[in-house]
Design a protein with these regions (language model features):
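Residues lining hydrophobic/aromatic ligand-binding pockets adjacent to catalytic sites
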Residues: 2-140
Length: 140
């Protein structure tokens, strides 16, 4: 087992002395309400709406890329209903086809170091950041 993976498994965070090596290690997702960490690297908010009750200081974001978030119509239709997840993934992926420059920029940032896609949804398995990460990793 590589040192980075071992350090991550032991504490949930990579050790400070390790640098992310593979693409999956370089691109993370994290709720905006979770405590920011140095190991997050560049923190990019990928929601269209600003998270409720979150100050800019507390969020500690590098950037807010609302243009890469699902459209208002798609977000409302989905309503974070897990039964709509497969169709949401398909529709959001189709929307992202018009954002090649933004996706390329995120890939470039991930090549330079850790990139954390930050989102506000309560459901950690069914949200736009999950889809976006899969696309950036070339899995969709």
């Amino acid at each position: 087992m590589r040192a980075t993976k071992a350090a991550t498994m032991a504490s949930g965070e990579p050790s400070k002395s390790t640098r992310p090596s593979g693409p999956a290690e370089r691109i993370r997702i994290k709720r905006v309400y979770a405590t920011p960490a140095k190991s997050d690297g560049r923190r990019i908010l990928v929601d269209r709406l600003w998270p409720r009750g979150m100050s800019k200081e507390r969020a500690r974001l590098s950037e807010w890329m609302k243009e890469i978030a699902p459209s208002a119509e798609l977000r409302k239709w989905f309503g974070h209903d897990p039964a709509r997840w497969p169709e949401f993934q398909r529709r959001f992926t189709a929307e992202l086809e018009g954002h090649a420059d933004d996706l390329g920029r995120l890939r470039d940032l991930a090549q330079k170091g850790r990139l954390t896609l930050v989102y506000a949804a309560r459901d950690e398995a069914h949200n736009n950041a999950v889809v976006l990460r899969e696309i950036l990793l070339g899995r969709k």
